[in-house]
Amino acid sequence: MLNQRSGALGSAMQQAGRQPLSRADAAMLADGFPKQLRASVCCVCDRIPMRTYSNVGWAASEDQLSWLLPDGQAIAFPFRLYILDGVPAGVFTPVQQTIYHCLFSRSCDGFVRERHIGALLEGEPPLWAIPYILKVCDEYVVEILELIYGRLAQRDTKWYRQLFSFNPRALLSGYNRMISYWNAYYRHRWSSYRQYVGFRLYRECFGYTD
């Protein structure tokens, strides 16, 4: 039934002049989620047309970010997504919508990343979505860091800390990357890295200690 529906949707998109994501791209994106969500990821990918920024010929970067989940499953998602955002939210189930937000939190467009991270943090995201939030915390768009800190500062962040405890290298490399962006872009605004929102995020919300 899933394959029949996927095939019908793909044909409709082709008739409308929009090519769906390839099977290879869909499989690559599915690797970023637990196996039990594979069917839901496929449904999401079936609804995403292959339209990219500047018409580049690939959906995502080759660089993959690997995370270990507490249940022992390993996931890997692309560093950057080059697909245009534009699928109406109403076509997805709640789980599919969360998957969509996760995917586009990796967009090459910072405004798109911010919008979808904000959507993920409107409530309590599922555990499998948290690696996508954690990854954005080591990046250079300070407005996104301020958004995340504003949402997490008053919450119980034990699941975020747990994910980092299972991925200590991600915690260390993410912290170092965040500090390097402060040094390169924001030192003139915050003379001490301890004043920087990224430092407060890692220390107060994720339990990082020097």
Residue ranges and their predicted role:
Residues 2-115, 155-210:
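Extended repeat-based scaffolds of very large eukaryotic assembly and lipid-transport proteins
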Residues 99-102, 130-134:
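Buried hydrophobic core positions in alpha-solenoid tandem helical repeats
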Residues 105-108, 137-143:
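Short coil turns that connect the paired helices of HEAT/ARM alpha-solenoid repeats
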Residues 108, 121-126:
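Helix-boundary capping/turn motifs
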Residues 115-119, 131-135:
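A short acidic, amphipathic alpha-helical/loop segment
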Residues 116-119, 144-149:
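Conserved hydrophobic register position within alpha-solenoid helical repeats
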Residues 122-123, 151, 155-158:
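Residue-level signature of the C-terminal ends
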Residues 131, 137, 148-151:
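Helix-rich alpha-solenoid scaffolding regions
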